[in-house]
Amino acid sequence: MDIRFSPHNSHLEDPTSFHFLDPHLRQLSRLPLVYRSELLGQLPRLIPGIYTISGGRQVGKTTLLKQWMAQLIKENIEPARIAYLTGELIDDHHSLVRLITDVLNDMPDSDLKFLILDEVTYIKDWDKGVKYLADAGLLENVVFILTGSDLVIIKDARMRFPGRRGQSDRVDFFLYPLNFFECVKLKSLFTFFAMSKFMLNFLNHFLCIQIYNCFIIILIYDNIIFVHFSTTIL
């Protein structure tokens, strides 16, 4: 693998120390509260295809992917079948095709491969590169995950390789910032078992108002202001 990507692929050298060597997981371990997204249980493991994860900048997409890599290793996926690349270091689709071809050739031939291309929209004409790789049959046995913050570009590019996404029922994912309910759960101020029936009913009522009534909700909790606006059912 290109040495530029080594800091994000320390699992190839020492999978048992991935949590300590990876920059994102190391930073995550220092935080007092760590959120585990439900997407970790929804991302593909068995079906090859081209998948996307969209979301705003700094919402945690890269950290989510590193958690997913660690989870794959924990589930006894061979580390050599997992690779992470970032589009910030790839100039154009020509470089992308060469790099991914080399990475896939270095992986074991048998079994499913897991390839992550983070911040794909940094790469000029990235969709041309992905289309070529798919048409050349190089992605037939690959769970290929692309991420990006520019939803318009990603949505437009998805249309350029229809029929090449794979057989999974779901191929597109979106990572949202934590909402108020998730923040409260993360704070561990209550559990569903310990909460009184009154509080549970109140919480359900609050969520219904938040979802169905299309207005701004402002809550002040623990000196933090939470603002939420919704015009559609989430």
Predicted segments with their positions:
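Hydrophobic anchor at the beta1->P-loop junction of P-loop NTPases
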Residues: 53
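Hydrophobic positions on the alpha1 helix immediately C-terminal to the Walker A/P-loop
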Residues: 64
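Interdomain motor-coupling "hinge/lid" segment immediately C-terminal to the ATP-binding subdomain
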Residues: 2, 154-234
